[in-house]
C-alpha cells in the first residue's frame, strides 16, 4: 500500500495561527509539497482578524482541517485544541511562518517506523528573515545521547522541526498548559521518560525569525524566563546525565534565575525578585562573565 492509499492519515501536521497572512500560505504549501503525502493538516486559528484562513481555504486541499476558535486561547491551549483533533500515528509540527523541506516528513516517518525506541525526531534547521533570506544554520550533535545531554542545559530541539508519536504524547495529555512559552520543551522532557529523542542531521526546516512574531512579543518575555527556569530545574532529574551535564544545567538554571529576578523586579514583584536572587546568588559571577562575553562579541561584530 502506498502512502496515498491509506484512509487514515499516517501523519497529523499540527499548526496554530494568529494573524499570519504574510507567511502562512508559504508554510502550508511546503506541507502540500511533501514527498510523503498521507497526511492531514490540523490548522487551529486562534481568532485571527486578518485573511489568513481565506488564503488557506482557497488552496482547496481536502486534507486541510481548519478549527476556528471562538475566543482567543493563546499558544499552548490552541496547540492542545489541535492535538485533540489529530488522527495520525505521528504528529508533525510546523508553525505558520516556517517552511518544511519537501522530504522532511518522508525521512522522519522512515526513522520512527524503523526505530521503535524513538518517541520523537527533529531536524537541523536554518534561520531565515521575513523575506526568506538565510540568517544562520544550526547544526549540532544529533544522536539520542547527545540530545538528552543537551536537554539539561541548552535544548536544541525546535518545535517546528519535530515529529513525535501521538500515543506517547497522549500519556501526558498533550502540551502542559502551565507553560505559555516553553510548552514544547516541557513535552520533550516528558517524552524522554518514555523513550529516546533524536535529530536527523540534515537541513530540513526553515525557521522564520520575525520581530513581531507572537512568541517574541512582550507578553511572552516573562513566560520565557519563568518557563526556562522551571523546566531546566526539572531537567536535572533526567536519567543518564553525566556530572558535567548537570553542572552545565546548574549554570543555565542560575542564569535563568537571575534573569527571572530582573524581569520580576521590573514587573513590580519585589518579593519574588529577592527570593530568586537569594536562591541564585552564586550565579552572579557567571552572569557578569556572560554579559562581558556578549558585549565583546557585539563589539567584534561591528569592528
Predicted regions and their residues:
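Conserved nucleotide-sugar donor-binding catalytic segment
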Residues: 84, 101, 123, 137, ...
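C-terminal subregions of glycosyltransferases and related glycan-biosynthesis enzymes
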Residues: 2-5, 185-186, 209-303
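Short aromatic/hydrophobic "clamp" motif used to bind/position activated sugar donors
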Residues: 91
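Glycine-rich, basic loop-to-helix element that forms the pyrophosphate-binding segment
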Residues: 69-86, 107
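Acidic helix N-cap motif at the loop->helix transition within catalytic regions
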Residues: 22-25, 50-58, 99, 103
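Conserved donor NDP-sugar-binding/catalytic core segment of glycosyltransferases
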Residues: 103-135
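A conserved acidic beta->alpha catalytic loop
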Residues: 30, 37, 45-54, 71, ...
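N-proximal low-complexity "stem/linker" segments adjacent to membrane-targeting elements
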Residues: 1-32
Amino acid at each position: 500500500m502506498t502512502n496515498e492509499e491509506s484512509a487514515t492519515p499516517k501523519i497529523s501536521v499540527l499548526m496554530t495561527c494568529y494573524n499570519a497572512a504574510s507567511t502562512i500560505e508559504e508554510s502550508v504549501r511546503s506541507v502540500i509539497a511533501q514527498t510523503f503525502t498521507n497526511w492531514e493538516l490540523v490548522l487551529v486559528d486562534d481568532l485571527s482578524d486578518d485573511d489568513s484562513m481565506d488564503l488557506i481555504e482557497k488552496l482547496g486541499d481536502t486534507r486541510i482541517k481548519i478549527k476556528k476558535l471562538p475566543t482567543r486561547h493563546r499558544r499552548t491551549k490552541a496547540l492542545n485544541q489541535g492535538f485533540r483533533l489529530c488522527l495520525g500515528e505521528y504528529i508533525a509540527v510546523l508553525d505558520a511562518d516556517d517552511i518544511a523541506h519537501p522530504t522532511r516528513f518522508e525521512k522522519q516517518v522512515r526513522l520512527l517506523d524503523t526505530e521503535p525506541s524513538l518517541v520523537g525526531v527533529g531536524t537541523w534547521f536554518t534561520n531565515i528573515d521575513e523575506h526568506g533570506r538565510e540568517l544562520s544554520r544550526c547544526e549540532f550533535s544529533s544522536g539520542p545521547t547527545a540530545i538528552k545531554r543537551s536537554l539539561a542545559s541548552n535544548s536544541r530541539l525546535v518545535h517546528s522541526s519535530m515529529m513525535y508519536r501521538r500515543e506517547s504524547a497522549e500519556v501526558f495529555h498533550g502540551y502542559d498548559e502551565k507553560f505559555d512559552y516553553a510548552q514544547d520543551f516541557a513535552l520533550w522532557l516528558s517524552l524522554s521518560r518514555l523513550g529516546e529523542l533524536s535529530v536527523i542531521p540534515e537541513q530540513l526546516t526553515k525557521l522564520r525569525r520575525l520581530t513581531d512574531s507572537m512568541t517574541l512579543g512582550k507578553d511572552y518575555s516573562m513566560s520565557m524566563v519563568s518557563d526556562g527556569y522551571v523546566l531546566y530545574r526539572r531537567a536535572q532529574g533526567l536519567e543518564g546525565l553525566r556530572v558535567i551535564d548537570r553542572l552545565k544545567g546548574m549554570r543555565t538554571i542560575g542564569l535563568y534565575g537571575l534573569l527571572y529576578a530582573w524581569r520580576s523586579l521590573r514587573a513590580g514583584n519585589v518579593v519574588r525578585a529577592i527570593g530568586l536572587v537569594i536562591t541564585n546568588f552564586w550565579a552572579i559571577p557567571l552572569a557578569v562573565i556572560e554579559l562581558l562575553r556578549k558585549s565583546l562579541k557585539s563589539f567584534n561584530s561591528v569592528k
